[in-house]
């Protein structure tokens, strides 16, 4: 009896072991299938990532190609500008070809890509180039208010004859109103005949072709955002025109006055700088007034302004490009700003004061003053 019970016990244990073995084998097969499926998913994911990587590399190569083309274009413009700077105080003849630095606009303004050669309309110019300083003044119609004659009188009368010989003042009429252009040209030729004849004073105008159609729409002419966008484009076109003419470019506006001997002080200060690492010099703290750039750097500035011309006013973009070019990645902004004095140089006291009260934006008044003037 005892032996029988033992045999039954062994049989029961054997059945349990067999069942457990079958269960384990079944689970192992399921696990193996899961592992195979998992491996297939991993391989599939790896293949997808590889395709994405190849696509990313292709896009990266395309982007680098575009940037390379832009860099070549900028280098060509800079070399062309250098050829002009070698001709100190020279006058361009009618047979000399101007560098087509305006082609860069086609990269950023799609409506210009089918246009031919781009260049502002010349109202009056003797083609002066190879001087030390180009002073750019952008102007638009302010209705019954005008400060341009006062500005030009202040800027030109406070130059010595030698300083006039070494500079060019460019008035850019950035207004679609043809009658305003005619009134500016008439005023300039009447009140500043000597400077026009000597070549120190030029007047250009920006054809409507340069602007996107949305900015020419009547509905946007009184829109503040559109006005700011157009102002960025106006300044960029003026910078490109002035670039091959001088070693330095000074941005002014059409409603300012200059201090006595401003030109002498500006020239002496620039020549006294021992460091050549400066980014730009501020001869006024207001907006974009009195900002001095090296002409060879203008291409980089214009590229940046055109990339973001629809997002911010130009004086804010100037702050942005300063932070991008000077600040180290990951560096606290405060630490960067402490080092800015060597790159963004501020001259005191300011050499220019804002005098206009009627803004170039329709219907707006502004009473901004430079407290350091």
Swiss-Prot record:
Q: How is it modified after translation?
A: Isoform 2 is N-glycosylated; consisting of high-mannose and/or hybrid glycans.
Gene Ontology cellular-component terms for this entry are: endoplasmic reticulum; endoplasmic reticulum membrane; endoplasmic reticulum-Golgi intermediate compartment; endoplasmic reticulum-Golgi intermediate compartment membrane; Golgi membrane; Golgi stack; membrane
Per the record, ranges on the Lumenal side are 27-373
Q: What are the entry keywords?
A: Differentiation, Endoplasmic reticulum, Glycoprotein, Golgi apparatus, Membrane, Signal-anchor, Spermatogenesis, Transmembrane, Transmembrane helix
- Which segments sit on the Cytoplasmic face? 1-5
GO biological processes: cell differentiation; negative regulation of protein glycosylation; spermatogenesis
Q: Does the keyword Membrane apply?
A: yes
Where is it expressed, tissue-wise? Isoform 1 and isoform 2 are specifically expressed in testis. Isoform 2 is expressed in spermatocytes but not in spermatids. Isoform 1 is expressed in spermatids.
- Glycan attachment positions: 29, 54, 144
Matching PANTHER family: ALPHA-1,3-MANNOSYL-GLYCOPROTEIN 4-BETA-N-ACETYLGLUCOSAMINYLTRANSFERASE-LIKE PROTEIN MGAT4D, N-ACETYLGLUCOSAMINYLTRANSFERASE VI
**Subunit arrangement?**
Isoform 2 self-associates; specifically in the endoplasmic reticulum prior to its translocation to the Golgi. Isoform 1 and isoform 2 interact with MGAT1, MGAT3 and MAN2A2; isoform 2 interacts specifically with MGAT1 in the Golgi.
Q: What else is known?
A: For isoform 1 inhibition of MGAT1 activity is demonstrated in vitro upon forced membrane-association. Its rat ortholog is the most abundant protein in testis Golgi preparations.
The family annotation for this protein states:
Belongs to the glycosyltransferase 54 family.
Q: What is this protein called?
A: Alpha-1,3-mannosyl-glycoprotein 4-beta-N-acetylglucosaminyltransferase-like protein MGAT4D
Organism of provenance: Mus musculus
Gene name, per UniProt, is Mgat4d
């Amino acid at each position: 009896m005892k032996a029988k019970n033992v045999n039954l016990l062994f049989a029961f244990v054997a059945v349990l072991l067999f069942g457990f073995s079958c269960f384990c084998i079944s689970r192992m097969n399921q696990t193996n299938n899961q592992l195979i499926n998992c491996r297939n998913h991993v391989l599939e994911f790896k293949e997808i990532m590889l395709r994405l990587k190849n696509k990313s590399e292709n896009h990266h190569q395309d982007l680098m190609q575009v940037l390379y083309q832009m860099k070549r274009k900028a280098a060509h413009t800079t070399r062309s500008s250098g050829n002009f700077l070698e001709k100190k105080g020279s006058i361009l003849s009618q047979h000399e070809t101007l560098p087509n630095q305006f082609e860069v606009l086609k990269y950023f303004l799609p409506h210009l890509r089918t246009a031919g050669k781009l260049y502002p309309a010349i109202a009056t110019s003797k083609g002066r180039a190879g001087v030390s300083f180009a002073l750019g003044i952008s102007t638009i119609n302010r209705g019954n208010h005008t400060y341009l004659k006062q500005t030009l009188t202040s800027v030109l009368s406070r130059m010595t004859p030698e300083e006039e010989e070494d500079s060019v003042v460019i008035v850019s009429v950035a207004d679609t109103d043809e009658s305003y252009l005619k009134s500016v040209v008439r005023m300039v030729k009447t009140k500043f005949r000597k400077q026009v004849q000597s070549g120190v004073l030029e007047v250009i105008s920006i054809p409507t072709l340069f602007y996107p159609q949305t900015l020419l729409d009547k509905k946007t002419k009184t829109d503040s955002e559109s006005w700011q966008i157009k102002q960025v484009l106006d300044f960029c076109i003026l910078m490109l025109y002035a670039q091959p003419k001088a070693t330095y470019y000074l941005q002014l506006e059409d409603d300012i006055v200059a201090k006595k001997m401003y030109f002498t002080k500006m020239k002496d200060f620039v020549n006294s700088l021992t460091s050549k690492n400066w980014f730009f010099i501020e001869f006024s703290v207001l907006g974009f007034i009195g900002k001095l750039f090296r002409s060879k750097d203008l291409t980089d500035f214009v590229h940046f302004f055109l990339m973001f011309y629809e997002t911010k006013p130009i004086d804010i973009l100037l702050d942005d490009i300063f932070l991008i070019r000077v600040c180290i990645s990951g560096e606290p902004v405060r630490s960067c700003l402490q080092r800015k004095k060597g790159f963004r140089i501020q001259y005191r006291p300011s050499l220019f004061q804002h005098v206009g009260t009627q803004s170039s934006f329709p219907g707006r008044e502004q009473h901004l003053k430079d407290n350091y003037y």
